[in-house]
Amino acid sequence: MENKSISVIGAGSWGTALSIHLAKIGYKVNLWVYEKFLCEQIKRTKENSIFLPGFSLPKLIYPTNSLEEAIGGNDVILIVVPTNFIRNILDTLAPFLNPSSVIINAGKGIETDSLCTIREIFKQTLPPTCCFATLSGPTFATEVARGEPSAIVVASEADSISHRIQSIFSN
């Protein structure tokens, strides 16, 4: 049986929209918010007024400013931060990850300093037992937050991981 709890690391418009979607289909979402003031505001108002204004966050979304708290023992972690911050975030998260964690990248781009792709960054920083996948597609945060029909692709080196992630996001 699937654990109905997921960590979303990054509360920009895309991370917030994915959190809303996951909460609407029954997942408890630990949403890591980098900005402490924004985290407190989201807790108070149940809205991310800076990155995704006008959308009420479901009760199943639990904002936190602590990466350790955001992981909270979850084995599915969605990374939704700008590429140039991914390496630092993963280094910080590593001690809190379960050996069988599934790390899903929902960003795009390359690391400016090293010219590494996100996949390369994940391979260099994560324990070898962690599985890695990418979520991508022609979607917009506001459309996903509104619950409009969307198509998104998940890719992983392991078909079983791709299918697992697909079942999580499908509704």
Where are these regions (language model features)?
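Rossmann-like NAD(P)(H) cofactor-binding subdomain of soluble oxidoreductases
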Residues: 57, 67-72, 76-149, 162-166
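A residue-level signal for beta-strand positions that form part of recognition/binding surfaces
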Residues: 60-61, 151
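Short, intrinsically disordered, charge-balanced linker/junction segments flanking boundaries
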Residues: 167-171
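Short acidic-hydrophobic sequence patches enriched in Asp/Glu that either
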Residues: 30, 34, 114, 161
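Exposed alpha-helical structural elements
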Residues: 37-38, 160, 164
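Short beta-strand-to-turn element immediately C-terminal to the catalytic PLP-Schiff-base lysine
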Residues: 153-157
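NAD(P)+-binding Rossmann beta1-loop-alpha1 motif at the extreme N-terminus of oxidoreductases
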Residues: 1-55, 62-65, 92
